[in-house]
Curated annotation (Swiss-Prot):
Protein name per UniProt: L-seryl-tRNA(Sec) selenium transferase
GO molecular function: L-seryl-tRNA(Sec) selenium transferase activity
This protein's record includes keyword Lipid biosynthesis: no
Similarity annotation: Belongs to the SelA family.
Any one of the GO BP annotations: conversion of seryl-tRNAsec to selenocys-tRNAsec
Gene Ontology CC, one term: cytoplasm
Gene3D superfamilies membership: 3.90.1150.180, Type I PLP-dependent aspartate aminotransferase-like (Major domain)
Pfam families named among the record's database cross-references: Se-cys_synth_N (PF12390), SelA (PF03841)
Cofactor(s) of this protein: pyridoxal 5'-phosphate
Name of the coding gene: selA
Length: 467
């Protein structure tokens, strides 16, 4: 047996297409996909054959049935949605890698109506003329925040870039060194500022910035003071920063506008529910800040969006900036954001129906009761595992409330038959992927980020992956 002989034993594309199992497959999978997977499988075998040494050639066999099984499996894998639902058992509420905020179940009908049909996206129904897509959300944002006007773009980095490009292109913007944040993915505020065309003037030190530092940096080229809320980290100890109100007064003294990026977009005072202080959008607006930017998909609990609120004078200018077109949001984002914001008209309703707020404010006692239910379901299956309930801490995530530790209860699972790493791996690769934590040789599932309707899926997953 030599490599040439083995190559001759490989089936051709046409031979495989004429196989009965493949013919049946083409009845449910597009032919183009099947042909693609056949060609890739043949190429994979060719590469493997080329890598064989003399001793391996002797025992090498071409198993046609195995090739067909692999092709069928690969075809179905290709047709599966890559972007799909997962179960978040990590306890990190705003898990960036798992999609951050969950949209409220209560808004799906409004979003679907807009998604599946024609809509009033850019039409003025009263006048029968072209309208603005931004009018759909600007009124409710203004009502909730108390701002003069509002504009929505596709994320908060875009919001900051649009604001700076409009208000400070080729001009200077003064920013404290202690607020030069990196917002994730290696994107940094100074980089966003440079891309906008604004010139950074950094003042103070990492841990201390005084009001006089801002004043000393003012020049005839100063276009704005910028405050960036350090929502994804905290500097503790020997520190000092300038309050927003102080900076606003300084801005009025020199006729310099104040821009504040508050990041997470809190619309409810979370301290009332046992969480740490996080500045609300309403506080920034009422303090006199000229322009405030924040995210839609963090603590606000809506879709990914960058929301700009503040003085109408500046927002009107932003609407004329060509970047607004590049950064504009689609009808799905508009529909989801408007419907989410409507829930804020009743604070109790917002806390109950917006998943992010509900998860953040759920008490440890409530989570414990839910943990008992899931634990009982797992134990009743008589699986080859040791399962227990333990106290633990959840995290907020998403670059929000970095020091916050939320008391929670978790299910700890230790398998008697497979390793913890293998168990975690199998759960993650389950058809509905289950993400967990691993600690002390146990798989940890935090109930804070688990929905009751997901319990059955979790139990079924354990049944299958431990077999």
């Amino acid at each position: 047996m030599n490599k040439g002989k083995i190559f001759s034993m490989l089936p051709s594309v046409d031979q495989l297409l004429n196989n009965e199992a493949i013919i049946s497959l083409i009845g449910v999978i597009p032919r183009s996909v099947v042909v693609k997977e056949i060609r890739q499988m043949i190429e994979e075998y060719r590469k493997n054959i080329l890598m064989l040494n003399e001793s391996q050639i002797i025992d090498f066999e071409i198993d046609i049935e195995e090739i067909i099984r692999k092709i069928i499996k690969n075809c179905y894998n290709f047709m599966d949605m890559n972007l799909r639902e997962v179960i978040n058992g990590t306890g990190t509420v705003l898990h960036t890698n798992l999609g951050r905020s969950l949209l409220s179940e209560s808004i799906k009908e409004q979003v679907w109506d807009v998604a599946s049909g024609y809509s009033t996206l850019e039409i003025d129904v009263t006048e029968g003329k072209r309208g603005s897509r931004y009018n759909h959300v600007s009124e409710i944002i203004k009502f909730i925040t108390g701002a003069e006007d509002a504009l929505v773009v596709n994320n908060n980095a875009a919001a900051v870039m649009l604001v700076l490009s409009t208000m400070a292109k080729d001009k200077e913007v003064i920013l404290s060194r202690g607020e030069m944040v990196e917002i994730g993915g290696s994107f940094r505020v100074p980089d966003v500022m440079a891309q906008s065309g604004a010139k950074l003037v950094d003042i103070g030190t990492t841990n201390k910035t005084h009001l006089k530092d801002y004043e000393n940096a003012v020049s005839e080229d100063t276009a704005a003071f910028l405050k960036v809320h350090t929502s994804n980290y905290k500097i503790l100890g020997f520190t000092e920063s300038v309050e927003v109100k102080e900076l606003v007064n300084m801005g009025r003294k020199y006729n310099i506008p104040v821009i504040e990026d508050i990041g997470s977009g809190v619309l409810i005072d979370l301290q009332k529910y046992g969480l740490s202080y996080e500045p609300t959008v309403q506080e920034s607006v009422s303090s006199g800040v000229d322009i405030v930017t924040f995210s839609g998909d963090k603590l606000l609990g809506g879709p990914q969006a960058g929301i700009i609120v503040g003085k109408k004078l500046y927002i009107d200018q932003m609407k004329q900036n060509p970047l607004t077109r590049a950064f504009r949001v689609d009808k799905l984002t508009m529909a989801a954001l408007e419907a989410t914001l409507k829930l804020y008209l009743d604070e109790e309703m917002a806390l109950q129906k917006i998943p992010t707020l509900k998860m953040l404010t759920e008490t440890a006692e409530s989570i414990y009761e839910r943990a008992k239910v899931l634990h009982s379901m797992i134990v009743s299956e008589k699986l080859d595992v040791v399962a227990g309930i333990a106290k633990d801490y959840s995290e907020v995530g998403g670059g929000s409330l970095p020091l916050e530790k939320l008391s929670t209860y978790v299910i700890e699972i230790e398998s008697k038959s497979i390793s913890t790493s293998k168990l975690e791996n199998r759960l993650r690769k389950y058809r509905t992927p289950i993400f967990s934590r691993v600690r002390d040789n146990k798989v940890i599932i935090d109930l804070r980020t688990i929905k009751p309707e997901q319990y059955e899926i979790i139990v079924q997953a354990f049944n299958e992956v431990i077999q």
